[in-house]
């Protein structure tokens, strides 16, 4: 990558507080774009709208999903917007390119029984289970992003208000409450997990060496929990975030409150969680609709 692209990624990291995972995606998108430029003998600063359309066709020819293509085009549009702020002679070739429509997927979430099974897996009275349980509790109890989790400091935990202050996207702070189970797991972890007691930093979640845990480390922990849990086949941090939102809405929480807890800027982003479970929809329907049941049915 050239120095402009490197400066762009650094701006996303420092000024916009992008996570490691998101930055890696942006970097991969730029590398793939550079490979296309080299293959077609094109220059970054003379790239035109016609070339952008050809690049769109090139991406589709690689049998990528529309969501992936959409993200890659968005990355390049954002990159050129950044470059334009540095050089008035640069034109954004992607600004008029029609965004491919995204496939709509319902967010995946865990049922309450599945969450109970996951928590039972980390009930063992071991040092590692103390740490693993606090990760699981915080992600499910608060719905925070994994990038927010790994940056929590000990002083961000408020045991008086029973909640945590996190730094979200765009460096925006928000306070998210947690319940009694989460509080207890944090207290047990701080009191009995030896690596956290001997470290020389303030990060809350650490690995077995006492070092601040990484996003990759959190994913490893969650995958390890799943391997030891019968009846649960897949997990990722965002699935726990989906579960948090879905369970709140299923129990009657209003959309605006969930939006605030998740740290979403737009209500439409939170709206995808109103799918609730099919089982919950049918339960509400049967109880609410006058002609949902015949008189002799229960």
UniProtKB/Swiss-Prot annotation:
InterPro entries: CB, DNA_brk_join_enz, Integrase-like_cat_sf, Integrase_catalytic, Integrase_recombinase_N, Integrase_SAM-like_N, Recomb_XerC, Tyrosine_recombinase_XerC/XerD. GO terms for molecular function: DNA binding; tyrosine-based site-specific recombinase activity. The keyword Cell division applies. Residues 105-286 form the Tyr recombinase domain. GO terms for cellular component: cytoplasm. Keywords: Cell cycle, Cell division, Chromosome partition, Cytoplasm, DNA integration, DNA recombination, DNA-binding. The keyword DNA-binding applies. It holds the Pfam family Phage_integrase. HAMAP family: Recomb_XerC_XerD (MF_01808). NCBIfam families: PRK00283.1, recomb_XerA_Arch, recomb_XerC. Belongs to the 'phage' integrase family. XerC subfamily. This is Tyrosine recombinase XerC. It comes from Staphylococcus aureus (strain MRSA252). The gene is xerC.
